[in-house]
Amino acid sequence: MSIKHYDKLVRDKIPQIIESSGKSCTVCRLDDESYLRKVDEKLQEELAEYLESHSIEELADLCEVVRAAARALGYTIDDLERVRAEKARARGAFDERLLLVDVVDVVDNGAIGDAPVGADWVSSCD
């Protein structure tokens, strides 16, 4: 008999899947503080797996853990989507693939001037 120790957050059906394979497992239900800590650890784990594979499966896992983190903090998925949409409206999304290279602070009469907005400030990244 061998025992492998995990001590990590798993999806809800994992214990049943393990038992249906003829193995047994020990699980416990976490309190709020411990759950949030394990969700944070799971976010790091899933992000690392996504960064290594760039697979849609790992991206979906990451999304699932983000949803769990939102719920653990008392937010609904609608709350998360509302804030995401507000930020996208106010600051944009990442659709244009812009890489900020540098910022020049131009001072004119004691006031910070704004750079012109438009396509002329966008160039290809080499």
PLM-predicted stretches and their roles:
Residues M1-D126:
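Flexible "arm" and connector segments at domain edges
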